[in-house]
UniProtKB/Swiss-Prot annotation:
<dbReference type="Pfam" id="PF00271">
    <property type="entry name" value="Helicase_C"/>
</dbReference>
<dbReference type="InterPro" id="IPR023949">
    <property type="entry name" value="Helicase_RapA"/>
</dbReference>
<comment type="subunit">
    <text>Interacts with the RNAP. Has a higher affinity for the core RNAP than for the holoenzyme. Its ATPase activity is stimulated by binding to RNAP.</text>
</comment>
<dbReference type="InterPro" id="IPR014001">
    <property type="entry name" value="Helicase_ATP-bd"/>
</dbReference>
<comment type="function">
    <text>Transcription regulator that activates transcription by stimulating RNA polymerase (RNAP) recycling in case of stress conditions such as supercoiled DNA or high salt concentrations. Probably acts by releasing the RNAP, when it is trapped or immobilized on tightly supercoiled DNA. Does not activate transcription on linear DNA. Probably not involved in DNA repair.</text>
</comment>
<dbReference type="InterPro" id="IPR001650">
    <property type="entry name" value="Helicase_C-like"/>
</dbReference>
<keyword id="KW-0804">Transcription</keyword>
<dbReference type="InterPro" id="IPR022737">
    <property type="entry name" value="RapA_C"/>
</dbReference>
<keyword id="KW-0378">Hydrolase</keyword>
<dbReference type="GO" id="GO:0016817">
    <property type="term" value="F:hydrolase activity, acting on acid anhydrides"/>
</dbReference>
<feature type="short sequence motif" description="DEAH box">
    <location>
        <begin position="278"/>
        <end position="281"/>
    </location>
</feature>
<dbReference type="GO" id="GO:0003677">
    <property type="term" value="F:DNA binding"/>
</dbReference>
<dbReference type="InterPro" id="IPR040765">
    <property type="entry name" value="Tudor_1_RapA"/>
</dbReference>
<keyword id="KW-0547">Nucleotide-binding</keyword>
<dbReference type="InterPro" id="IPR027417">
    <property type="entry name" value="P-loop_NTPase"/>
</dbReference>
<keyword id="KW-0067">ATP-binding</keyword>
<keyword id="KW-0010">Activator</keyword>
């Protein structure tokens, strides 16, 4: 390369250094100073990764003094270029030596990089275009936020998330029965709200014992990194901000923390967008004396726009408290309890009409009269005639039924505020089969119990019952903690034999404490060499993940997983169908939680529940109360908490030392009360609410679309190529999984989410659902989103030169492929992307300026191209400059015309959708007070704002590919 002192060059490998100046040429070496950073670089003259910077007539160059020159011509003297043209400030003719060019010039625009010889690899141009297409595809999907989470595609869950997640500041009560996935529904809504920009700051309030469960659930299922706040964290965060809640965007805390006035005041001042409250049935309220917990949530609900309340038992504390929770969501709508009761009584007529529409039979006269009265402001006669007709297409009849049903749902009931699915309305649950195994009480335990009784001591009734239910713990208190109770406990002998006879089955074992779980693992390992792993609260999240993964492995994995009560919270193992309850919890909700580890939607087999117990002990009496009184082993018991509250004292007395008559009396009373509560719940089922909550055919359609998206092989190929380009090392691990690690040749110094020790991922949803340690990769996953951002946010692939070997075209024929981006700057919360997302516009020009993009598709054209090295590419660009400059101007004309059309379509779509929704809600507001004025006002403001943003839409050249025909 010919070098001369003072010449300006740029580094091909370190473009961030800016414009360099040759300061020394000696022998075979050249030294370049980069004044913008003050750094020197020494290169071999023959192989220097440098590109000479020479501007052309028509370009604008900037001097180091800040003024610009419009270049008209250039001259060269002693190897240095002098630019001549018009001074930007004086308007007069001026000259500028290249040595006086601005050092900070960077070639960010594709045209500048192309003419400066900064030409990228051919495959990088392709991956950049694919990245822009993927971003556009994601932004335009009406299912945005539903595909990425690692959850099963359950229709009713996806329906609720789809309906609620799209709203501005949703305020709803999620009240599905146990096991139907309220946490997943809430997570899906949170994920949607964050991904679409409707929310940025989220506060989740949960019982103290569930903080960790929610933290794990949000991270593992939704890739959302929440922070758990307690008093210590608040004190620690005070160093960074006066209000600790401002130090994080996504926060989980307990209700106990917010009972403190100081912390509540700080939370009230923290500008949350969305508030989520789990176990909301604990919020007790009466008009005269609302509980402190209720007052805390009420204060927050008054200042936070979006509120999600979660409860499996909305009537647990009475119907008045249920009304109070609805009042938290919309105090204007639910202002009077008596009015609420009167309105509820009218729901029965609506439910009868809804059930008639939801079926297939012809409508009765009573149903028609009821519908006509309920929808009096609408002429429904044509729809009724269609439904009643004999020889009409069934699809048309079904459409008419669906339309009338939707009208009912819109106009009556609490459908927009309350969602509740029951096991009666959602199919797909397995049977629960209970097996009990009696064993004689060991003499060692009897001795420990006698010693304990002689020693006396003050203990509560509940503490005595807990001791009676876990004799091994009492035994260890007297013998010492290392006592090997498992060497004589007959339940352990039974467990070993059971596992040996079920070697091909995965078995989940749950015990009350971590010590018991660890002892059981030791017993299985030392006595029979049975592969088992433990899972308890003393382990870190990573350790629990590894244990769960070891249990989930089909080949070489653990046969049994032994969990403690707390350690198993939030984890589901529905790939197993055998559950061993080594002991029983005192609380019916905890029993249901244990069984719920396996009894979930998605469980493929009947669940076998095994309970080894000690005869004539508290264990047998509690078993009988659960089984005969509540039928809690074989069916879910929504009234379990109420029954325990009512019978707790009698139950504890029976457990500690009651006789058979007391037990029989307790069982009779419990059975009677259980039937009463069950009947009341059945009578209270709101059929209209259930129809609205599970979504019917619409929910199934959403799931089908998501399932099709999961099978998109094009997406998988694009993501794999993206990682290849970036330099991510990919190791096939088998079982549909890949291990990703940063390689030594990463294109970017950091890749957030990609750790040094690797990340295991899969594109298969079923694999991800069965393995907590494997991430599910979709286009919504942070690893994909980050990869797209790294490519599109850098200059990777913005310039490329290729050869087209085609003898049907004259050699030297030139094509210019231009990728423009149509975009409009707007806050993410405006949701402009729904109408005008960042859209790639492809223009393919021949040398005469004709756009061939409609005739020559990208994929077929790309397959015919061959790469050229950078130096040859740079020479070809230089030789083609006279042709290229006018083509760029022509390309922009075509692209601008396309943008104008896109903006017009976006405006029409926006106006049509929002006006239609506004008209619908305004008409509904007259008959359904559930429609909030805030929603209407939001839609009006959104239309005005979006119109302004569309007016400011922009066009930007994103990437260039110059193609020359060759016959060689």
């Amino acid at each position: 390369m010919p070098f001369a002192l003072g010449q300006r060059w740029i580094s091909d490998t370190e473009s961030e250094l800016g414009l360099g100046t040759v300061v020394q040429v000696e022998g075979r070496m050249v030294t370049v100073l980069f004044p913008a950073t003050g750094e020197n670089r020494m290169f071999s003259r023959n192989e220097a990764p440098l590109t000479r910077v020479i501007y052309n007539p028509g370009d604008t160059v900037e001097s180091h003094e800040g003024w610009s020159l419009s270049v008209e011509e250039l001259t060269e003297k002693d190897g240095l270029v002098v630019y001549h043209g018009i001074h930007s400030e004086t308007g007069e003719k001026a000259s500028l030596r290249e040595t006086l060019l601005n050092h900070n010039i960077r070639f960010n625009k594709p045209q500048d990089r192309l003419f400066a010889g900064q030409i990228d690899r051919l495959d990088r141009f392709g991956i950049r275009y694919q990245c822009q297409l993927l971003r556009h595809q994601l932004a335009t999907s009406d299912l945005l936020g539903l595909q990425g989470p690692r959850v099963g595609l359950i229709p009713h869950q996806m329906w609720i998330a789809h309906e609620v997640g799209r709203r501005y500041a949703p305020r709803v009560l999620l009240a599905d029965e146990v096991g139907l996935g309220k946490t997943i529904e809430a997570g899906l809504i949170i994920h949607q709200q964050l991904l679409t920009g409707r929310a940025e700051r989220v506060l989740i309030i949960v019982p103290d014992t569930l903080r960790h469960q929610w933290l794990v659930e949000m991270l593992r299922r939704f890739n959302l990194r929440f922070s758990v706040f307690d008093e210590d964290r608040c004190v620690e965060a005070f160093a960074d901000h006066d209000n600790p809640f401002y130090t994080e965007q996504l926060v989980i805390c307990s209700l106990e923390l917010l009972r403190k006035k100081k912390r509540l005041d700080q939370a009230l001042d923290a500008d949350w967008d969305l508030l989520v409250v789990d176990e909301a049935h604990h919020l007790e309220w009466t008009e005269e004396a609302p509980s402190r917990a209720y007052q805390v949530v009420e204060a927050l609900s008054e200042v936070v726009p979006g509120v999600l309340l979660l409860t499996a038992t909305p009537d647990q504390l009475g119907h008045e408290s249920h009304f109070a929770r609805l009042r938290l969501l919309d105090p204007d709508r639910f202002y009077d309890y008596d009015a609420f009761l009167a309105e509820e009584n009218s729901y029965k007529d609506v439910a009868v009409a809804a059930e008639a529409l939801a079926g297939d039979a012809k409508l009765s006269d009573a149903a028609i009269n009821s519908l006509t009265e309920l929808l009096s402001e609408k002429d429904i006669a044509p729809s009724i005639r269609l439904i009643q007709a004999e020889d009409i297409d069934s699809e048309l009849q079904q459409a008419a039924r669906s339309e009338l049903l939707q009208e009912l749902l819109d106009r009556h009931g609490t459908g927009r505020v309350l969602y509740r699915n029951s096991r009666a309305s959602v199919k797909g649950f397995p049977k629960r089969i209970f097996n009990a195994y009696p064993h004689a009480m060991p003499e060692q335990y009897l001795t420990a119990a006698r010693v304990n009784e002689m020693m006396g001591g003050r203990k509560t009734l509940e503490a005595k019952a807990a001791q009676a239910l876990s004799p091994e713990k009492l035994y260890q208190e007297f013998e010492d903690n290392s006592a090997s109770w498992w060497k004589f406990d007959p339940r352990v002998d039974w467990l070993i034999e059971f596992l040996k006879s079920h070697r091909s089955k995965k078995v989940l074992i749950i015990a009350s404490g971590a010590d018991t779980a660890l002892s059981l693992e030791e017993a299985l390992r030392t006595r029979e060499g049975i592969q088992a792993t433990v899972f308890h609260e003393g382990m870190s999240i990573i350790e629990r993940d590894k244990a769960g993964a070891y249990f989930a492995q089909e080949e070489g994995g653990a046969q049994a997983l032994i969990c403690s009560e707390i350690g198993s919270e939030g984890r589901n193992f529905q790939f197993a169908s055998h559950l061993v309850l080594f002991d029983l919890p005192l609380n019916p909700d905890l029993l249901e939680q244990r069984i719920g580890r396996l009894d979930r939607i998605g469980q493929q087999n009947d669940i076998q529940i095994h309970l080894p117990y000690l005869q004539d002990t508290a264990q047998e009496r509690l078993l009988n109360w659960y089984h005969q009184g509540l039928n809690a082993f074989e069916l879910t018991c929504p009234s379990g908490h109420v029954l325990y509250s009512e019978f707790a004292e009698d139950l504890l007395n029976v457990l500690v030392g009651g006789d058979e008559d007391e037990l029989t009396n307790l069982l009779n009373h419990t059975q009677s009360r259980y039937k009463e509560l069950k009947h009341a719940m059945e009578q209270g089922r709101d059929k209209l609410l259930e129809i609205n909550s599970h979504g019917g055919d619409k929910a199934k359609a959403i799931v089908e679309r998501l399932a099709q998206s999961d099978q998109d092989t094009k997406l998988i190929g694009s993501v794999i190529r993206l990682w290849d380009i970036i330099g991510v090392d990919q190791e096939d691990k088998g079982e549909n999984s890949i291990i990703l690690r940063p390689s030594e040749h990463m294109m970017f110094p950091t890749y957030p989410g990609l750790y040094e020790d690797g990340v295991t991922v899969t594109f298969d949803r079923d694999t991800a659902l069965s393995r907590d340690d494997i991430a599910l990769i979709t286009q919504e996953h942070p690893l994909v989103q980050t990869g797209l951002d790294l490519i599109t946010g850098s200059d990777t692939g913005t310039t490329s030169v290729a050869i087209l070997k085609n003898k049907a075209l004259p050699a030297g024929t030139l094509f210019l492929e231009l990728i423009y981006m149509a975009d409009a700057s707007a806050p993410k919360s405006s949701q402009l992307y729904r109408y005008l997302p960042p859209t790639p516009i492809r223009v393919l020009l021949d040398k005469n300026g004709n756009d061939l993009s409609a005739k020559v598709d990208y994929t077929s054209f790309d397959k015919q191209l061959s790469a050229v090295n950078r130096h040859i590419g740079s020479k070809l660009v230089t030789a083609s400059q006279p042709i290229l400059h006018p083509l760029f101007a022509k390309g922009e004309e075509y692209a601008q015309a396309a943008v104008n059309e896109l903006v017009a379509q976006a405006r029409e779509k926006m106006t049509s959708q929002l006006t239609g929704e506004l008209d619908r809600l305004e008409s509904l507001k007259a008959v359904n007070p559930n429609i909030r004025e805030e929603e209407l006002e939001y839609l009006r403001n959104q239309m005005q704002e979006l119109s302004t943003y569309l007016d400011a839409s922009q066009l930007q050249l994103d990437a260039i590919r110059m193609v020359l025909v060759s016959h060689v």
